[in-house]
C-alpha cells in the first residue's frame, strides 16, 4: 500500500479530500479502496454544476469485481471533473492520490472539513479493518 499523503482528509468510506490553495476541494478514492476494488473498468462522473451533499453518492467506480459509490466528503457544487478517467479509469489504480482524482467541489461550508479523518486517523482505521 502506498504512503498516505499528509495533506489529505478522509471519510471512513475511503474517499479523500484535498483542500486546494483556491479553497476548492479535490476528491478521489484512497489507494486502499482501489486495491480492494481491483482493476477499474468504468467511472461514472458527476456533472459540472451538480450539487453534492456530504456523505451522499456523487460518482461511481466499477471494477471487474464490483461497483461502488464514491461519496462526497463535503457539500457544494462540482466545478471540475477528471474526464480523462472516462477513457482511462485505471488511472485511479495507478495513482489514486494524484492523477486519479475524480472531481473538484466548490465547498459550501469549510467547517465540514473538520469532521473528516486526518491521515493518522485514517491509517488507524485501516489497521483496525485488517484485524
Curated annotation (Swiss-Prot):
Identify the Gene3D superfamilies for this entry.
Answer: 2.40.50.100
**CDD domains annotated for this entry?**
GCS_H (cd06848)
Output one GO BP term: glycine decarboxylation via glycine cleavage system
Q: Pfam families from the entry?
A: GCV_H
The record's free-text note on cofactor binding: Binds 1 lipoyl cofactor covalently.
Q: What GO CC annotations are associated with the protein?
A: cytosol; glycine cleavage complex
Which residues does the UniProt record annotate as the domain Lipoyl-binding?
Answer: 24-106
- Please list the residues that carry the modification N6-lipoyllysine: 65
In terms of superkingdom, the source organism counts as Bacteria
What keywords would UniProt list here?
Answer: Lipoyl
InterPro entries the record matches: 2-oxoA_DH_lipoyl-BS (IPR003016), Biotin_lipoyl (IPR000089), GCV_H (IPR002930), GCV_H/Fam206 (IPR033753), GCV_H_sub (IPR017453), Single_hybrid_motif (IPR011053)
Q: Which cofactor does it need?
A: (R)-lipoate
Q: What does this protein do?
A: The glycine cleavage system catalyzes the degradation of glycine. The H protein shuttles the methylamine group of glycine from the P protein to the T protein.
Q: Assembly and interactions?
A: The glycine cleavage system is composed of four proteins: P, T, L and H.
Give the record's family classification.
Belongs to the GcvH family.
**What is the name of the protein in this document?**
Glycine cleavage system H protein
Organism expressing this protein natively: Xanthomonas axonopodis pv. citri (strain 306)
Could you read off the lineage of the organism from its UniProt record?
Answer: Bacteria, Pseudomonadati, Pseudomonadota, Gammaproteobacteria, Lysobacterales
